[in-house]
Amino acid sequence: MGPRGAASLPRGPGPRRLLLPVVLPLLLLLLLAPPGSGAGASRPPHLVFLLADDLGWNDVGFHGSRIRTPHLDALAAGGVLLDNYYTQPLCTPSRSQLLTGRYQIRTGLQHQIIWPCQPSCVPLDEKLLPQLLKEAGYTTHMVGKWHLGMYRKECLPTRRGFDTYFGYLLGSEDYYSHERCTLIDALNVTRCALDFRDGEEVATGYKNMYSTNIFTKRAIALITNHPPEKPLFLYLALQSVHEPLQVPEEYLKPYDFIQDKNRHHYAGMVSLMDEAVGNVTAALKSSGLWNNTVFIFSTDNGGQTLAGGNNWPLRGRKWSLWEGGVRGVGFVASPLLKQKGVKNRELIHISDWLPTLVKLARGHTNGTKPLDGFDVWKTISEGSPSPRIELLHNIDPNFVDSSPCPRNSMAPAKDDSSLPEYSAFNTSVHAAIRHGNWKLLTGYPGCGYWFPPPSQYNVSEIPSSDPPTKTLWLFDIDRDPEERHDLSREYPHIVTKLLSRLQFYHKHSVPVYFPAQDPRCDPKATGVWGPWM
């Protein structure tokens, strides 16, 4: 109201003045109320995402493993255990879908991983999760494994939305020396070099220090020094429990009963990782952040049985589209959950975290390309039905099995799509899709053995009876999570429907981007892996 209107007001005590004694105390109460005391009054939650590397389905106590994981078990028991949760079968694809909210067929990363000398990274026109959270007012930190490309500085974590970064850029390295050795084909030389960064600078002085301990210490420092009133996003991508199988001696002793050497060392690595998780959550509590924190734990893919991991009783392993390669170990722990101590059976995928976390942060996804992920917070927190009814595991026309079965009993076969009812999609292509309870696999999905836990059974693997020419499977995953009973002949109409869905995704996918090695990656001159273009 302008000055003229103000002058026309009555001079006596009007209704507004009479309300002041009532309204002012109410306003003070609202301002002084503790966070979370009323609907819409609390601050956006702190978000802590802890990603384990190569952790298998049967490698945690809450799935019945003999490996002791008391901290993970307690968090899962007091939170929401995700029992129908999926990742990708490999490192780079899972990490890219976590941070983009988009299937790898959208980014050209549907084939294998990004290798050290490939001039590749998550496309620079993709808007990543940390960028969206920064826009929502968050401080964003990353600690640990990047593995989303580093050939240009523009690909580095600090150029993709993270305020700080501490970790390694490639897919694996020595836990103590922090060096990675790689064959550079064009030069016919294997080069070993340091891969450790603090921000964009090379981080030295950490030799002979175990990486999980270093990363945990940095994460705790970030938590301890963080002002509670500022929303925090911490992405802690541990090296554990990816090979090489290295761990301090004291973590091996509790598992001397395990005779298999790989499994023995792997068990110790899992225990150390579990201890790290306990230390991080303890820091969140002692710093006063826990009561307003959403803590998410996830693996990036199934366990690698060749390096101590185990996915029993699920079929397959890392690199495969069988459940053992893609069914993820995961849970959410938080005082903010409306239901706790439950097992959630709703369908959730790693691409769902981006829209879920951005919504929790009260941000928006403006500027992103069309998302494949869904906001699943109500599904997790309240037990509501998942908005996701379909999940594309992958389509990779160039698939090469880098982790073949012993004696390699299966191999890519000829296309079965000559059959009229299967004409929608080339069934020789490595692909898999989930719709409701149904899962369809085509081509060669990867090693299809079942691998019992070492030292607990008299067999090291249980081969499949499938003929090597087979290129099509249909399973009811709800009733048959171990993928033992192929129903493709019994339900041809389901097969036809899912093949048409695969064809739809294939039609709307971008070409595979898997460039040849660039010899300019050679770190000989500097002794350090890093950007070269």
UniProtKB/Swiss-Prot annotation:
Gene Ontology biological process: autophagy; colon epithelial cell migration; lysosomal transport; lysosome organization; positive regulation of neuron projection development; regulation of epithelial cell migration; response to estrogen; response to methylmercury
GO MF: arylsulfatase activity; metal ion binding; N-acetylgalactosamine-4-sulfatase activity
Superkingdom, natural source: Eukaryota
SUPFAM superfamilies linked: Alkaline phosphatase-like
Effect seen on changing residue 192 to R: In MPS6; mild form; severe reduction of activity
Any Pfam family: Sulfatase
Region forming the signal peptide: 1-36
Subcellular location: Lysosome; Cell surface
EC number: 3.1.6.12
Record annotation: effect of changing residue 531 to R: In MPS6; mild form
Binding site residues for substrate: 145, 242, 318
Residues with glycosylation annotation: 188, 279, 291, 366, 426, 458
The entry's keywords: Calcium, Disease variant, Disulfide bond, Glycoprotein, Hydrolase, Ichthyosis, Leukodystrophy, Lysosome, Metachromatic leukodystrophy, Metal-binding, Mucopolysaccharidosis, Signal
Active site: 91 (nucleophile), 147
Protein's job: Removes sulfate groups from chondroitin-4-sulfate (C4S) and regulates its degradation. Involved in the regulation of cell adhesion, cell migration and invasion in colonic epithelium. In the central nervous system, is a regulator of neurite outgrowth and neuronal plasticity, acting through the control of sulfate glycosaminoglycans and neurocan levels.
Name by which UniProt lists this protein: Arylsulfatase B
Species this protein is from: Homo sapiens (Human)
Species lineage: Eukaryota, Metazoa, Chordata, Craniata, Vertebrata
Gene name per UniProt: ARSB
